[in-house]
């Protein structure tokens, strides 16, 4: 099965504490949980948490901001041409399966 959201996509958060925020997908995480596929994405500037880091010989301690994963069901692809969120579809062009935006029909590279 193809992934609807991949690294480098511009996405918008559709539910949760960061609803309405936009960012770029940094990493996509997939795993199985009780036989079901559970997918998460790390998005820049979204779901930021503070973490206390203990001092070591190589680095100083302190509080740092890290981006936590967000469930793929809580984000949607952002169509920059229309300025709205959109769904992802698949179609074949020259016997090659490609993703496209359902709102504008634009092919996603």
Swiss-Prot record:
The keyword Lipid biosynthesis does not apply. Disulfide bonds: none annotated. Keywords: Ribonucleoprotein, Ribosomal protein, RNA-binding, rRNA-binding. One of its GO terms (molecular function) is rRNA binding. Pfam families: KOW (PF00467), ribosomal_L24 (PF17136). InterPro entries: KOW, Rib_uL2_dom2, Ribosomal_uL24, Ribosomal_uL24_CS, Ribosomal_uL24_KOW, Translation_prot_SH3-like_sf. GO terms for cellular component: ribonucleoprotein complex; ribosome. One of its GO terms (biological process) is translation. Part of the 50S ribosomal subunit. Belongs to the universal ribosomal protein uL24 family. NCBIfam families: rplX_bact. One of two assembly initiator proteins, it binds directly to the 5'-end of the 23S rRNA, where it nucleates assembly of the 50S subunit. HAMAP family: Ribosomal_uL24_B (MF_01326_B). This is Large ribosomal subunit protein uL24.
């Amino acid at each position: 099965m193809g992934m609807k959201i991949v690294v480098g996509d511009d996405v918008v958060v559709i539910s949760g504490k960061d609803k309405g925020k936009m960012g770029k997908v940094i990493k996509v995480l997939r795993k199985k949980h009780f036989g079901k596929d559970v997918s998460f994405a790390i998005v820049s500037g979204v779901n930021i948490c503070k973490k206390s880091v203990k001092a070591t010989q190589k680095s100083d301690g302190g509080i740092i901001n890290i981006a936590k994963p967000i469930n793929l069901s809580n984000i949607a692809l952002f169509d920059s041409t229309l300025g709205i969120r959109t769904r992802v579809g698949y179609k074949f062009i020259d016997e090659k399966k490609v993703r496209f935006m359902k709102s504008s029909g634009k092919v996603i590279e």
